[in-house]
């Protein structure tokens, strides 16, 4: 099948994912997503048919938000590694970055910030992969109940049943 990426045609096989096709044809390192037929999509998504693809980089508004979203997840992973007892609440992207609400036995202080930053850098340096997985609401609730994450369970229960639930792990 033919995949048009940034107005140039490339050959792809059914089942190829965007990331593989992009890696084979582009040297750019700051590609974080793609718009497939004008729909923002994850690079791990498979190519289903002839498509028009626009690459999204960290220089783009959508790309910057994806980078911030990834940083929030990296922060969450770093916190859980440093403080496994921490309850994760919510970590949304905002205009100038992101924040993460957490509940921990011992409140974080200024002294904790370099430790968290260093852990995030270590994870990033070793190419710590955070993958998106779409699952059912029931499965997501079961996962967070098993992890003893009541705030995540509460948030999931508030989401309408027809919404797509994606976990990043």
Name every feature range the model reports, one short phrase each.
Residues 1-72, 76-97, 115-122:
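Ubiquitin-like/PB1-type beta-grasp interaction modules and other compact soluble beta-rich domains
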Residues 45-66, 87-93, 99-169:
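Auxiliary tRNA-acceptor-end handling modules of aminoacyl-tRNA synthetases
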